[in-house]
Amino acid sequence: MSLVYGLVVNGPAYGSQASRKAFQFAEAVLAQGHSIKKVFFYQEGVLNASSLILPANDEVDITKQWQELALRHDIELETCVAAALRRGVIGEEEASQHQLKQHNLAVGFQQAGLGGLATALLKFDRVVQF
């Protein structure tokens, strides 16, 4: 039986194992034939969606890995808009709305509210938080 998963990532790209563990879990779930419809980045997890993250050459680029996984498996990558704005991760729409000249939301990520997550939770067989 194939299950539909949703993931919630609360840890930043670096300085915590949460994002890396979530990514490894996602790969394992997909390899077993299940699907993941959404990865929601919340609290410090929104930092995974910054296009300004530049890891050293010998480090894993977790943001790029999330982007590639999402493309390969049609997974939505969403950040909590309030948490993201609070931490300086700004999408193009929010930059325009707040009259900012720059935005730094990485390609493939979208910003959404917690209401969107709550609605999506009803569609998943399993939700795993990291």
UniProtKB/Swiss-Prot annotation:
The keyword Nucleotide-binding does not apply. It is found in: Cytoplasm. Its EC number is 2.8.1.-. Transmembrane segments: none annotated. One of its GO terms (biological process) is tRNA wobble position uridine thiolation. GO terms for molecular function: sulfur carrier activity; sulfurtransferase activity. It is an enzyme of class 2 (transferase). Keywords: Cytoplasm, Transferase. The keyword Transferase applies. GO terms for cellular component: sulfurtransferase complex. Could be part of a sulfur-relay system. Belongs to the DsrE/TusD family. PANTHER family: PROTEIN YCHN, SULFURTRANSFERASE TUSD. This is Sulfurtransferase TusD homolog. The lineage of its organism: Bacteria, Pseudomonadati, Pseudomonadota, Gammaproteobacteria, Vibrionales.
